[in-house]
């Protein structure tokens, strides 16, 4: 059998609640308490630069408080006064409703119960008999008040001529630029060495662009008395992140697109890139995902499913009364007593070369992405229910490690990046899957990381958060603890696993592999194998 090229990771980039992925800054923010003073200062300086602060020297607490999961900030929306239109029915009851209005604001189709009388060239009087319904703009308290947000003050659209791009696409441009800058090689030189059709780009968004500059604006414009612009529809497409990378960052002309698999979408795209490198269809592959779901409409959809941790439920978990403040930093509690996940925004990117190109150009090799396994759940009673697919992907991933590294390295040199959303169902099903997989392969004390406790759940980009953070763990020799929890829930299976609320140090030389697990809604299970 002919030798296949090995897909190696030569760069990473991205932005999420912990800061920049490049330079492993984001991982350092998550493990901040375990850093030495020099590392802490470097982390603070990186974040201060993003946040537009002149100096980090006297801003430590401000920087820490305005990163990771926290109360939703007003640049997204006001959680204490969410705008909505309340139905406002009226009855004249013998006393007609009467008001003056500018002629230009009259509806095109005058209701039959309206009597309209001209009062001037520009104004009319409206007299309404009987029943009439209005929509009254008002506001209300939002049930969910926490999200994983980009560092306060960091506005990706201000860093390039964004021209009213949706936030997810602005984040995409910044993430791709971050990865390109972190590559350490001149992109023009790479383009001269690699044929144009040998550069693949796979990046997307699980939900598309749903903020007011994308599909969100398109769907609600007329309802709110505004017009639909020509940008709303095309910029909302789910594969648009790859299009933006090709057009605005790389000028790439190779294979492109996005494969969507709910929360596993980043890994689906990584699978595409690995396949292209292995087959020789590409020598370079940019892999990414971007999600910007922190708006009231999207969050209300997840809240209606019972998926998000609400302030009321967090109060009940912590035994707080209505006058006591909820710690929004602890909203996401994987594998503990919990009540839902915490939504987040993120854009993550990795760059793959084939191993020969990496050696030829002298690229830094951060690790190898050897496999991504995808399996559906099969028949099940509910589309949201768990199934057998993730058992299969986990088993295949660990078997792949054993085939490449051998039995001893598989048992002693790895870690698992859990999906770890913070929902009651996930803590039971995923801990069962991880435990049974470890048991089947003879692994004891398998370290489990659950980074959504810091970052929140960025949907299609979530497994990208896991991948880039894993590279940071190998660099720093640090697994951030699940520090939002007091104890594991009683229904969490712990056999053969090592959960920890505390940060754990290890010698980076001992790192052999990581298994990245993702359980996408609907049965989109994906597990990736990464080698150090």
Where do the language-model regions lie?
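Flexible, low-complexity linker/loop segments at domain and module junctions
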Residues: 1-9, 190-196, 408-410, 441, ...
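Condensing-enzyme catalytic core mediating Claisen C-C bond formation in acyl metabolism
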Residues: 3-17, 313-407, 414-415
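A glycine- and small-residue-enriched flexible loop/hinge segment at structural boundaries
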Residues: 6-19, 31-189, 206-218, 237-255
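Conserved catalytic cysteine-centered active-site region
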Residues: 48, 123-170, 208-272, 305, ...
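Active-site-proximal alpha-helical scaffold in enzymes
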Residues: 171-185, 238, 242, 249, ...
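Conserved small-residue
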Residues: 176, 201, 266, 273, ...
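Beta-strand segments within the central parallel beta-sheet cores of soluble alpha/beta enzyme folds
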Residues: 190-201, 256-260, 282-290, 364-373, ...
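Acyl-CoA/ACP chain-elongation machinery
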Residues: 281-339, 372-386, 420-427, 444-497
């Amino acid at each position: 059998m002919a030798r296949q090229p090995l897909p190696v990771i030569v760069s990473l980039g991205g932005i999420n609640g912990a800061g920049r992925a490049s330079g492993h800054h984001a991982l350092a923010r998550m493990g901040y308490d375990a850093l030495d003073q020099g590392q802490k200062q470097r982390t603070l300086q990186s974040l201060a630069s993003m946040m537009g602060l002149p100096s980090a020297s006297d801003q430590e607490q401000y920087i820490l408080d305005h990163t990771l999961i926290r109360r939703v900030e007003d640049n997204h929306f006001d959680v204490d006064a969410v705008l909505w239109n309340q139905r406002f029915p009226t009855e004249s009851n013998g006393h007609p409703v009467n008001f003056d209005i500018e002629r230009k604001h009259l509806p095109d189709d005058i209701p039959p119960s309206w009597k309209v009388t001209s009062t001037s060239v520009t104004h009319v009087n409206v007299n309404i008999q009987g029943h009439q319904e209005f929509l009254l703009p008002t506001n209300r308290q939002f049930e969910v008040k926490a999200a994983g947000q980009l560092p306060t003050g960091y506005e990706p659209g201000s860093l390039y001529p964004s021209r009213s791009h949706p936030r997810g696409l602005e984040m995409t441009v910044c993430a791709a630029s971050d990865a390109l800058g972190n590559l350490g090689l001149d992109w023009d030189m790479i383009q001269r060495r690699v044929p144009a059709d040998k550069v693949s780009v796979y990046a997307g968004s699980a939900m598309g662009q749903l903020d007011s500059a994308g599909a969100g604006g398109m769907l609600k414009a007329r309802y709110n008395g505004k017009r639909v612009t020509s940008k709303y529809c095309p910029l909302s497409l789910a594969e648009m992140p790859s299009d933006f990378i090709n057009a605005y960052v790389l000028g790439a002309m190779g294979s492109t697109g996005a494969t969507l698999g709910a929360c596993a979408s980043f890994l689906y795209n990584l699978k595409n890139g690995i396949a292209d490198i292995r087959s020789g269809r590409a020598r370079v592959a940019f892999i990414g995902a971007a999600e910007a779901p922190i708006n009231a409409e999207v969050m209300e959809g997840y809240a209606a499913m019972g998926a998000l941790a609400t302030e009321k439920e967090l109060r009940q978990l912590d035994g707080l009364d209505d006058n006591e403040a909820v710690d929004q930093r602890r909203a996401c509690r994987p594998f503990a007593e919990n009540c839902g996940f915490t939504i987040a925004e993120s854009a993550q990117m990795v760059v793959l070369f084939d191993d020969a190109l990496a050696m030829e150009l002298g690229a830094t090799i951060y690790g190898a992405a050897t496999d991504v396994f995808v399996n559906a759940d099969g028949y099940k009673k509910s589309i949201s229910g768990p199934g057998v697919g993730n058992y299969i992907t986990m088993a295949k991933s660990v078997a792949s490690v054993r085939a490449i590294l051998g039995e001893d390295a598989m048992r002693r040199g790895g870690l698992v990046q859990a999906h770890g959303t913070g929902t009651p169902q996930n803590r039971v099903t995923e801990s069962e899957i991880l435990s049974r997989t470890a048991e089947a392969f003879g692994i004891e004390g398998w370290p489990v990381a659950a980074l959504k406790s810091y970052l929140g759940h960025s949907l299609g980009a979530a497994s990208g958060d896991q991948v880039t953070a894993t590279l940071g763990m190998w660099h720093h020799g640090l697994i951030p603890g699940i520090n939002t929890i007091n104890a594991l829930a009683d229904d969490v299976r712990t056999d053969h696993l090592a959960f920890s609320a505390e940060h754990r140090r290890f010698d980076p030389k001992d790192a052999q592999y990581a298994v990245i697990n993702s359980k996408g809604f609907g049965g989109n299970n994906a597990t990736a194998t990464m080698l150090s």
